[in-house]
């Protein structure tokens, strides 16, 4: 029985980890090796996964700082940084707020901006941002990666990459986007090209570099580009 349980655990582990697998080539040939990504790894690719019930804001902010700005920060580092500017008791019961994020970002010498916009304008947003959604009665911070047509692509620290119909997203969103602005922004960061759902056939439009003028609309200044 112990051997059976161990085998099952190993099987589960293999399904959640990347592996290099060999595939038969032409008849009589050798194997062709290809790196295979597990479903879980694909789901959280380029996202910082939250580890606690209250840390969705920290994980979302860590995702943007790491993937869009190259800052070597994980969720725990961001939690510690934000706790220095927040009330620990409020955080324990309610989680972090956008104000906590703003204070932390500004302590790093960066800027934070909150914008209230209509759902129909989301496609004009050219940078990844943090938004607050209400999902099944719970308020939850996620990374708004991109809006294309009638779909919104979200990096959820708890659930991974998600795609919502724009109308569905708008029902659970409070209408505010929280943008992090500063030097070192990578215009080709992976958050702008989220993976399509595994069942989808259509791919995102080919990535187009973001122009300076588009970034400056959201608070970037010329010195941020050098």
Swiss-Prot record:
Gene Ontology cellular component annotations, sorted alphabetically: membrane; periplasmic space
Enzyme Commission number: 3.4.22.-
CDD domains the UniProt entry points to: Peptidase_C39G
Mutant lacking the gene: phenotype: Deletion of the entire fapA-fapF six-gene locus shows no visible growth phenotype.
GO biological process: amyloid fibril formation; proteolysis
Subcellular location: Periplasm
Alphabetical keyword list: ATP-binding, Hydrolase, Nucleotide-binding, Periplasm, Protease, Signal, Thiol protease
Domain of life: Bacteria
Active-site annotation: 56
Peptidase C39 domain segment(s): 50-180
GO molecular function: ATP binding; cysteine-type peptidase activity
Cited PROSITE patterns: PEPTIDASE_C39
Keyword Transcription regulation: no
Family label: Belongs to the FapD family.
UniProt protein name: Probable functional amyloid protease FapD
């Amino acid at each position: 029985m112990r051997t059976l349980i161990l085998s099952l655990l190993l099987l589960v582990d293999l399904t959640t980890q990347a592996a290099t697998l060999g595939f038969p080539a032409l008849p009589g040939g050798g194997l062709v090796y290809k790196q295979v990504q597990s479903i879980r790894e694909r789901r959280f690719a380029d996202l910082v996964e939250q580890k606690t019930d209250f840390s969705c804001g920290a994980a979302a902010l860590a995702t943007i700082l790491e993937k869009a700005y190259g800052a070597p920060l994980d969720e725990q580092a961001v939690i510690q940084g934000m706790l220095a500017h927040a009330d620990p008791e409020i955080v324990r019961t309610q989680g972090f707020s956008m104000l906590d994020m703003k204070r932390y970002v500004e302590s790093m010498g960066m800027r934070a901006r909150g914008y209230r916009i209509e759902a129909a304008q989301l496609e004009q947003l050219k940078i990844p941002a943090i938004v607050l959604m209400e999902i099944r009665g719970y308020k939850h911070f996620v990374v708004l990666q991109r809006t294309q047509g009638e779909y919104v692509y979200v990096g959820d620290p708890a659930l991974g990459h998600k795609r919502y119909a724009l109308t569905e997203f708008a029902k659970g969103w409070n209408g505010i986007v929280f943008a992090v602005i500063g030097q070192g922004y990578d215009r080709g960061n992976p958050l702008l090209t989220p993976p399509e759902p595994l069942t989808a056939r259509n791919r995102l439009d080919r990535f187009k570099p973001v122009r300076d003028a588009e970034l400056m609309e959201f608070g970037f200044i010329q010195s941020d580009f050098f």
